[in-house]
């Protein structure tokens, strides 16, 4: 790899409603790196009993999201009817394609007791020919 291809991406902190992420992409001067649109490191965040993340239902199109947790658990729900918890070591791959709506929230059991959350989420641009593919969701324990 040539020295001209090397660069350092510095994250900026973004509040997502009750917890912060360190967002590496997009940033200046790099809006994307290859197909990667967003690259977020969530946490580590400690939630007291009764608290947690509440990413309300929202749409995506033309991309895929990949979620991986180190700590905690998130409950994913989407317009396909999927209800799936993601735990440390699992991978959730959601392909938005022509459109999907989803939410991500702290699992009810952990909301009752309090929990720690830490993980990664990246948004990947689908190839042009797949941007309008059927939406899909897959869970890989």
Question: What is each model feature region?
Answer:
Residues 1-11:
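Short, Gly/Pro- and small/polar-rich lid/capping loops
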Residues 66-88, 101-103:
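A short beta-strand-loop-beta hairpin characteristic of the jelly-roll/cupin
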Residues 14-70, 119:
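A short glycine-rich, His/Asp/Glu-containing loop-to-beta-strand
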Residues 118, 125-141:
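Conserved, well-structured core segments that form or line functional sites
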């Amino acid at each position: 790899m040539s020295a001209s291809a090397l660069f350092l991406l510095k994250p900026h902190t973004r509040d997502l409603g009750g917890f912060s992420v360190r967002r590496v992409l997009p940033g200046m001067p790099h809006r994307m790196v290859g197909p990667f649109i967003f690259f977020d490191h969530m946490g580590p965040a400690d939630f007291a009993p009764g608290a947690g993340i509440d990413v309300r239902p929202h749409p995506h199109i033309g991309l895929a999201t990949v979620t991986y947790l180190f700590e905690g658990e998130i409950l994913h729900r989407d317009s396909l009817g999927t209800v799936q918890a993601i735990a440390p070591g699992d991978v959730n791959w959601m392909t938005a394609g022509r459109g999907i709506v989803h939410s991500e929230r702290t699992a009810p059991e952990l909301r009752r007791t309090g929990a720690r959350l830490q993980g990664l989420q990246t948004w990947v641009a689908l190839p042009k020919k797949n941007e309008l593919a059927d939406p899909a969701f897959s869970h890989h324990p």
